[in-house]
UniProtKB/Swiss-Prot annotation:
PROSITE patterns: RIBOSOMAL_S17
Source organism per UniProt: Dehalococcoides mccartyi (strain ATCC BAA-2266 / KCTC 15142 / 195)
Biological process, per Gene Ontology: translation
Gene3D superfamilies: Nucleic acid-binding proteins
Amino-acid biosynthesis listed as a keyword: no
Lineage, broadest ranks: Bacteria, Bacillati, Chloroflexota, Dehalococcoidia, Dehalococcoidales
Full protein name: Small ribosomal subunit protein uS17
Keywords associated with the record: Ribonucleoprotein, Ribosomal protein, RNA-binding, rRNA-binding
Length: 86
């Protein structure tokens, strides 16, 4: 495990207890056609205090495995998001 590996993304879902889903946009280049395309990587992140909400921009840090798919934890909330009711 790499030390101090951090990423910045936005919260997609906060419906689980102590867990949030974070989306991180990644730009990749096709190896043959050289076209750049975007993908959103989704990570399960441990949020001990349930403080992050949908739309927040957050920083996550890699940690020991907490469950089968959860090995990132919330480091800090950079900006609070706002939810627009439809």
């Amino acid at each position: 495990m790499e030390k101090n590996k951090t990423r910045i993304g936005h919260v997609i879902s906060d419906r689980m207890e102590k867990t949030i889903v974070v989306g991180i946009d990644v730009a990749k280049r096709h190896p043959l056609y050289k076209k750049t395309y975007r993908r959103t990587m989704k990570y399960l992140v441990h949020d001990e205090k349930n403080e992050a909400k949908i739309g927040d921009m957050i920083e996550i840090v890699k940690c020991r495995p907490i469950s089968k798919g959860k090995y990132w934890r919330l480091n800090r909330i950079i900006t609070k998001g706002h939810i627009v009711a439809a």
